[in-house]
Amino acid sequence: MSKDRDGRRTSRRGTLKKIGGFSLGALSFGAVGRTQAATGSSVTTADIAPPGPNGDPKSVQIDDKYTGAEMYGEGDFRVGLGTDLTMYPPVYRESLGNGSGGWEFDFTVCGSTACRFVDSNGDVKEDDKAKEMWWQEINFNDINQDLYSRNDSDWVGSTPADTQPEFDYTEFALARDGVTLALTALNPAMGSLALGATYFLSDMVNWIASQHEDDSSLKRKWDYDGLSGPLYADSSTYLLARDEMTSNSYESFTIDNIAVAFPEFPVRTKYYVTFTAPDDPSTQSISTLEEEGIYRVPATEVAAARPPGSRRSKSAADEMVYVADPKKFIEVEPVKNPSIPDRIYEEIEQKKKQRSRKQ
């Protein structure tokens, strides 16, 4: 992190987050607002995980659930949230850091929710949907390096929506796998509710309702509340993020995934995350790299793995790329039973007042 001429903190985030000529921080969307995709900024699997022996990501799933009374007196229902956090192998590229080299830590956060009525025993009735979803949000807090996301369809998506997707998430491996793993956490929380990834992905579109980011936080939010009230019983979100780090540095932050159902039922999953960027691999011996689990991939192999028109050009074929073992350089700790932030209850009350004024 550096300072500009006015003494303000600056970083590559301000440049990296530019989409189609405008900054993400200035954007605000309607309840079902479609984002604009940036030309030439798509992400390929080769960008996230170049070929090599360290290609297996590190994934952790957690869930939360709450059972309460349906807002119109139709009985009790349960809202469940399953979250998958998948960390991909750290990648070193000589082109980062204005040519001085640096590490990319890519990860996805996928959250799936379901609302179902329960019987007199408190067991979920699988086919009895409670259309009570209100909103979902993902928050990264305590950021101190160049952690960012984009608005492109292969960086963010959500279902439900009442429009057909312009991007086929069922064919996108990162979203498909992330939602599938999120469901492995959601299903036990919802009494082994039988839901498949395609159920969500076939309706997923590239949109967010609102967002915020500054030097220490990043937030994406999806509102599912229609003008006439709640319309959906299920929802799912997908978010890809990237942390660009200098060699021999570390980053610790938290990830929150929160879902809220009517009339006032929030559920929350939370992780503590630490990234440790290895030393500059170009200065290390082969034996040291092997000992630390770092593998060198010639960029010609990486370029060959990318489809035509991918974000990274083959003109960088002389760049050497290194891939590190995520198990050695990434720590993820799920937080047990995190409390609901006061701001969520405050927002619930504010939204209730807004709804009452409209009615």
From Swiss-Prot:
Give positions of region: Disordered.
40-59, 340-359
Return one Gene Ontology term, BP aspect.
Answer: killing of cells of another organism
Q: What is this protein called?
A: Halocin-H4
Q: Which domain of life does the UniProt lineage start with?
A: Archaea
Name the source organism.
Answer: Haloferax mediterranei (strain ATCC 33500 / DSM 1411 / JCM 8866 / NBRC 14739 / NCIMB 2177 / R-4) (Halobacterium mediterranei)
What function is annotated for this protein?
Has antibacterial activity against other haloarchaeons. Interacts with the membrane of the target cells where it causes permeability changes that result in an ionic imbalance leading to cell lysis and death.
Does the entry feature the keyword Secreted, yes or no? yes
Subcellular localization, as worded in the UniProt entry = Secreted
* Signal keyword on record: yes
Signal peptide, first to last residue: 1-46
| GO annotations of cellular component type | extracellular region
Mind listing the UniProt keywords for this protein, alphabetically?
Antibiotic, Antimicrobial, Bacteriocin, Plasmid, Secreted, Signal
